[in-house]
Curated annotation (Swiss-Prot):
Subunit structure, interactors included: Homodimer.
Record's keyword annotation contains Methyltransferase: yes
Protein name: Ribosomal RNA large subunit methyltransferase H
InterPro entries on file: Alpha/beta_knot_MTases (IPR029028), RlmH-like (IPR003742), tRNA_m1G_MTases_N (IPR029026)
Molecular-function annotations in GO: rRNA (pseudouridine-N3-)-methyltransferase activity
Main location: cytoplasm
Catalytic activity: pseudouridine(1915) in 23S rRNA + S-adenosyl-L-methionine = N(3)-methylpseudouridine(1915) in 23S rRNA + S-adenosyl-L-homocysteine + H(+)
Localization annotation: Cytoplasm
Gene (name only): rlmH
Length: 159
C-alpha cells in the first residue's frame, strides 16, 4: 500500500523530525510512505476572514496539486468522524481489500483545510475536539498509522 501524508508547513523542531524519522522507519515494513511538505502561507496577525479564506484556498490548491485521481483521500478535520485506533486499522485494512492501494492523508495549516480539499476528501477524520499544532499532528498521525498496521497484523504493540 502507498500512503502519502500531505502536510502544510515545514518541521523546524529537531525532536519532531526525529519522531517522524522513527515512525517512517517502522512503517517501511508495512507500506510505502511518502511525506509531502508544502510551504504554508504567512498569516498576518490582523488577518480578516477574507484574508484567511484566501490563504486557505492557496494552501488548498497546493495540496490538491499533489492529490492523484486514484487516491483515497482522508482529510484531518476538526469536524470529521472520530475513530478509535481499531476503527482506523479497520478502515485502512478495508481500503486495501477493496483495491484502494493509494491513500493520501492531509493535514492542513494553522487555519485548517479549504472547502475544496474537504470536498475532495473521501473521508474526514478527527482525532479530537481539541486543536493540535499541525507539526505535532504529523507525529500523532504517523503513530496511529503504525498502530493500525500492528493491529491489522495481529502483532503486539504497547498500549
Amino acid at each position: 500500500m502507498n500512503i502519502t501524508i500531505i502536510c502544510v508547513g515545514k518541521l523546524k523542531e529537531k525532536y519532531l523530525k526525529l519522531a517522524i524519522d522513527e515512525y517512517s522507519k517502522r512503517l517501511s515494513r508495512y507500506c510505502k510512505l511518502n511525506i509531502v511538505e508544502l510551504n504554508d502561507e504567512k498569516t498576518p496577525d490582523n488577518a480578516s476572514e477574507k484574508d484567511e479564506l484566501i490563504i486557505k484556498q492557496k494552501e488548498g490548491s497546493k495540496i490538491l496539486a499533489h492529490v492523484k485521481e486514484n487516491m483515497y483521500v482522508i482529510a484531518l478535520d476538526l469536524n470529521g468522524k472520530m475513530a478509535s485506533s481499531e476503527e482506523l486499522a479497520e478502515l485502512i485494512g478495508d481500503l486495501g481489500l477493496k483495491g484502494k492501494s493509494n491513500i493520501a492523508l492531509v493535514i492542513g495549516g494553522s487555519l485548517g483545510l479549504s472547502k475544496e480539499v474537504l470536498n475532495r476528501a473521501n473521508y474526514k477524520l478527527s482525532f479530537s475536539k481539541m486543536t493540535f499544532p499541525h507539526q505535532l499532528m504529523r507525529v500523532i498521525l504517523l503513530e496511529q498509522i503504525y498502530r493500525a498496521y500492528k493491529i491489522n497484523a495481529g502483532e503486539p504493540y504497547h498500549k
